[in-house]
Every structure is written in structure tokens, then in C-alpha cells.
Amino acid sequence: MNYNISKEKMMVGFLLTLFLLMNSCMQDNKGFSNLNIAQFDSLRIITSADNYLKLEPIPITNFSCDRSLGTVNDFYSEGDYWWPDSTNADAPYVRRDGMTNPENFKAHRKAMRDMSIQVAALTAAFKITHDIKYANHAVKHLKTWFVNSDTRMNPNMNYAQAIKGICAGRGVGLIDGIHLVEPARAVTVLENYNGISKTDSEEIKKWFAQFLEWVTTHEYGIDERDRENNHGTCWVMQVAEYARLTNNSELTNYCIERYKTVLLPNQLGEDGSFPMELKRTKPYGYSLFHIDIYAMVCEILSTPDDNLWAFELSDGRGIKKGIEFIYPFIKDKSTWPYVHDVMYWDQWPVRHPSLLFAGEAFNNAEYITLWKSLKAEPSADEGMRNFPIRQPILWVN
């Protein structure tokens, strides 16, 4: 056996253990706390963060696609379910719902997702250990993506989810931006724990304010907002988090009202399902994805005076009913009464944030116990694409 362990590593391990033991019994009034998450999730968080310390930031400027009409700083992606016309190679692409085209340009999406994963893990490790090395590396990623002029992403998604022969970009492309939500939350955590300078945080917030302006005024943003399925909910989640970060109370209030008057009435069925998602070729995965986004909307926007977790329409529809619908099928997937997903059926379920945060909101230990029993995250690229919240410790006080 190798006993050659540095004193520094021994001290870090000792301090982390001491921190977790001292706080393991500290509970909030709902029987749930970030300290319990730290205790449960610390090994995964710190192991990942230590690996990410070895990786340099990778901006979108490292990759280009000759099909993009944008500049090197413009995010570019292509529609997932669009394929070449088998009868005419020169014709516009045709749609095959649920079937992802593996030949599409994915480099910018992957770079954004990797940044999101790494910034979130590094910030989570910093919150647990208070070791500044994690914060410094997270900030390095954030500045690469949102501050440095030669590598930053332009604050728009004009060229997201393009379709060959049809459009250079479109409103539904904004859904690619869901992987910016956790980095936005990380900025606040870094601020709260003195892990980022005021200058750096203000520059990053400036980028998000500009992006928020684009999301809420550009025709693509408006188009995405008005989508009736999960796309419209993802718009609200993004706007809610970016508005919170940039102290835009007007947009925060707008999102609260939109959840109450547009999302719930038009999306949630009487039984708590999402009927539009059940009609898709991947109804299980989309139902899980959509309830997770609902949960994040409630988590971001709820206040002591306006708790969206408790909000219900006059007929009783609310997120509580949505969680109650999907919970049995997370607990026992074999009971799912609808068609199986055409792809990636085996990727789900995982530690869905809706389970964890609903467990907190409704003081339901069964939800939290089930969350703990599941694998941390999906493994396939498409699964990761629809799983933007990976570090719940960033979302609790």
C-alpha cells in the first residue's frame, strides 16, 4: 500500500471531515438543508472539481462551422431532429421528431455544457471547502466565456439551432442556453463566499444583462417565450435566473405572473401530467425534463410572500400535482403506462432536482430518499443536454 500522502492533502481531508461532522445535525425547519447535501454529495463534488482543476477553459472561439453565418464569437448549433432529405441531397432538411442527427454541429453546445458542468462543480467545491483554488478556476472559466473580448460569447443566440436550407437560426435555439443558468447562480455563490472580485462579478453581470435584453426583446426570444411546451418554460427559467442575478425586478415579477397565468393553465393537465410532452416520441424523458424546469422556476422565483411551490389554480393544478403525477414512474419506471421513448429510454431517471426541491418544499422525505438512491446524472450526450441543474448545493442557502 502507498502511504505517501502529503500533509496538505491530509489537512484538507481532516478539515472537510470536521466541517461535515460539525454540521451534519444542523437542520432547517423543513428537515432539509444544504449541509446535508454537502455531507451526502461532497465526494462526488470534490472528486469532480479536482479533475476540473486540471482542465483549461474551452470557449466557443476554439471551434467554427462553415455553415454558420455568425462570427467566431457567435454561438452556433443545428436543429436536433433535422436530417438530409434522402430523396434529394440538395433539398432542405426534413424533421424526424425524437431522432437526433449525429452529424449536426455540436461543438459549441458541448463547450457550453462543459463550462456549465465545470463552473458549477468548482463553485460547489469552493462552497464546501472554502478553498480559493476552486473559486479561482471557476472565475477563469467565467471570464473566458463572458468577459475576455477575444474568447467571450456574444450575448445572443442569433445562430442557434439552424436548419440547412431553411433558416440560419431560430427561436427554439434559445433552449441551448439553459446551460447558462447554473453558471449564473454560481456567480452569486462566489460573491457570497468572497470567491470573486467585484470587478469580475460586475463584468459578468453586464454580459447577462445584455443577454437578458436580447432574450426578452429579439424576435427569437419572443418566439421562444410563446412556445406552449417545455420551450416556453425554459424561457421563464432562464429569464428568472438572469433577472435575479442582475436585479431586474420588473422581469422577475413578469416571470412570476407568466408562471401563474400562462404556464400552469396551458401546460399542466388535470392529472398533473404534461399532455403536450406525452404526445412526443420521448414522453418519459420530456416529462421528467419539464417537471425539473418547473421546479427550478418555483425555486428561483418563490419568496416568503409568494411561494410558487404552494400556488394552485382554482381547480387545484400546481407543481405539487405535477410532482405527484411523475413520482410513481420515477420510483418504478416499469409502471410507465405510455409509449417508451424512441431513444435514450435507459438514461432516466437520475437525481432530478424536482424530487429534491419538492422534498424540501413539501417536507416529503420519500422524495428526498428516492433522489439519493438514483444515479447522479445521465451519461449520454442527449441526456446531459436535458439536465442543466447538476449541483443542488448551489441553490440552497
Question: How would you describe each model-predicted region?
Answer:
Residues 2-12:
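Bacterial N-terminal signal peptides that target proteins for export
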Residues 13-23:
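Bacterial N-terminal signal peptides
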Residues 25-224, 257-260, 300-305, 312-397:
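Extracellular glycan-targeting catalytic surfaces
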Residues 105, 198, 216-227, 246, ...:
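Active-site-adjacent structural elements in folded domains
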Residues 176, 232-233, 287:
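An alpha-helical repeat/solenoid feature that recognizes helix-turn-helix modules
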Residues 207-249:
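Loop-centered beta-sheet repeat module
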Residues 237, 241-337:
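Long, repeat-rich segments with strong aromatic
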